[in-house]
Amino acid sequence: MKKTAPTAAATSAAPLFANFRQAMTWVHTWFGLALGFVLMVCFYFGALSVFDREIDRWAIPATRFAPQPMPSFDRVLRPAFEALEPDEADYALNMPTLHDASQGPMTPRTELPADEYWAYTTHRDPVLRMGAGFAVPHPKDPQGHNHIHGQTTIDPRSGQPVPEGALKIGSDWFYPLHYSLNWHWHNAGYWIVGLAGMAMALALLTGIVMHRKVFREFFTFRPAAKLVQRSALDLHNMTGVLALPFHLFFALTGVLIFAGWMYFPVSQTVLHPLHERHEARQAQATGLPHQRAGVPAPLASVDAMMAEARRRWAARGMPGEVGFLTLHHVGDANGYVSLYRAGSDRVALVGQGIHFQASSGQVLREDPPPGTIAATHEFLTGLHLQHFRHWLLRWLYVIGGLMGCTCIATGFLFFVEKRKKQHAKTGSSGARIVDALATACVTGMVAASFAILVANRLLPADLHLAGWDKGDWEKALFWAAWAASACHAIARNAPVAQGRISPAWREQCQAIAALGLAAALLNWITTGEHLIKTLFTHTYWPVAGVDLSLLAAAAIAACAARRLRQRAAAQTPAPARKAAHA
């Protein structure tokens, strides 16, 4: 019987994928490729952020001393708070939006009245981060959050601020990079990272569907395989399976942390009136004033309140220090002080609060244990941020983050290795483009993170040039180093179009090795604190740990560069090798 060709209608009705597994493979490949570059940034700088305070100590030698408890408010914090001014950038950006022009001209920045104070410290902080909210006198929305903010970091032993212009590279640069890309225009960075987090959860689930023999693949790794494609896939599968719970947890909790106020801010938009009524009712129920009374009142001794809070915590069987302090309605009869126990021995960021009337020191309220929903949210948030004391878990976080980087990087390699020879035959530039982006995002990103540390040690502390201080120049050099790595990756990956390895990988590994070694040596030269001193004679683990990590990364990068050179030599045709040696 003669077979007839399928009609156009039948052809058009054919499914795009033969089965569900093929569909999941497509989703895994293209979602992972499209957003894997963002996820690489999140995982790498998230891993560095686990030790953000330690990186700060390395970057700011003046802060290299032992962690300190919350200092005296009356003697140290109060003068520091009173010296705070609204941030110039925050004032310029938000004051025109918050101020009601029909009520007259804007209040000058330095004349805004302080409305709230806060200070926060952990068991790893030698210095104290503190800030203030300054009220906008004539706001457009009297029920809104009408504050211009100012922040500083002080030495809690003396109350003096850290050196002006000093950038806390760990907590103020690497840490926000992993959740905002340090791109604050219309909060675009937050949204991109949130989308990437959801895509990662989808990629992990589709990866499980793709690899049905998960447990066998977990124990399969062939580093000596002749094909880079095979060893890259093995390592991709192994790291993805081994750290699967870690990856899923951090992707979902990362989105959860920002869901309430960034991704689904219904309490500040459509439900804003209801939210305000709820806050007023809650203030009435708790006895904590929601608004200012408009009557000036003095401030009682906050040190006495801190002593009373410590006594009450000890009586409840959980002795501890104050970790978080806030003062609401500064200078007003409705002012009150909230003291929260440091959370170093618990997953939640802080313990239950005790609230005092600011003018008299009388206890207004002791917070009850949180309900199920609040406790779950506190637990998940605290486990993600990990401000509690658990050094083994902290290192496991780093390992999990680096395994995430490995999983993503090997996914890029597998994509390129699988397609580059076919693309070389057809003249397609797809593999070459992905390889250049992957090089810039993997080795280029690491090189940029080391370059900012080198710049930190080379630039003078009192630098002021072209309106920028030292911290501004460090940020600029970070982006410049990353951009240079991207340009280098594009310029040097022509061999990929011929089905061979791009030399940019090897050369950027060499740059990482040089930068890592240079950063450790420059720390010794500029501060006199070498590893023998920080490990043995005057042990200081934050600096020693950063130096050791830099040297270890430099050694790994040097070994990788050597292996890449050997692979490239093996791929080079014999006539070309003879010509190169002629």
Question: Positions of the model-derived regions?
Answer:
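Conserved histidines in hydrophobic membrane contexts and catalytic metal-binding motifs
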Residues: 2-582
